[in-house]
Amino acid sequence: GSGQARLATAETEQRPTVLGLIASGRMRPDTGVVLIGGAENNSAVRRKVALVDAPDVSDPAPNVTVFTVVSEELMFAGRPSNPIATKAWLTEAGLLGISRTPIADVAPADRLRILLELSVLRPDVEALVLVSPDRHGGDPHVWWELAEEFAGRGLAVLVIAGQAAGAVLAGRAARAEMDETEVAR
């Protein structure tokens, strides 16, 4: 439900992205359905669920600067995305100092905060699916705190990460109920 953060674990390189695509209504599962408000409606799911940092799908190219990432995401959100607006967003977020840094070189926590904050600017977004934050390294508790922070704003948050990160968060992160045997066989 909304206002909650859930963790799903998935191994192999492709599986987290596949789960993310299914959970965000961008791919049909072989079996089962994704429901929003109890009804199956892929276009509504796609509008309401932001797929965040999914490898090869929604992650920014590694050599792109933070400034460019922010400018593009502001545009996708229907916001002013000119250099002045982009600089203002970065300043307000306290990130102007890293604006010229390639996104691949940004600390994991800052990278995820940038991408999550920009995702929630989109008009209809009610839920976030964050894919493989553990691939950037760092402490899983840091990105889990981010997930809980966004859930605290009333968003539904699903984080899909590897089992090692899941083990670190055992007892802390509420688990998503997904039948792994039916997904991406």
Name what the model sees in each region.
Residues G1-S2, V120-R122:
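Phosphate-binding P-loop
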Residues G1-A10:
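Pre-Walker A (P-loop) beta-loop-beta motif of ABC nucleotide-binding domains
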Residues A10-F76:
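ABC ATPase nucleotide-binding domain signature region
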Residues I114-L121, E148:
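Short alpha-helix immediately C-terminal to the ABC signature
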Residues P123-E126, R135-V168:
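Conserved catalytic loops of ABC-family nucleotide-binding domains
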Residues E13-R15, D56-P60, P133-D139, A164-G166:
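Short acidic, S/G/P-rich loop/turn micro-motifs used as interaction or catalytic elements
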Residues A54-I114, D124:
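ABC-family P-loop ATPase nucleotide-binding domains
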Residues S2, A85, E149, A164-R185:
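Actinobacteria-biased recognition of intrinsically disordered, low-complexity terminal regions
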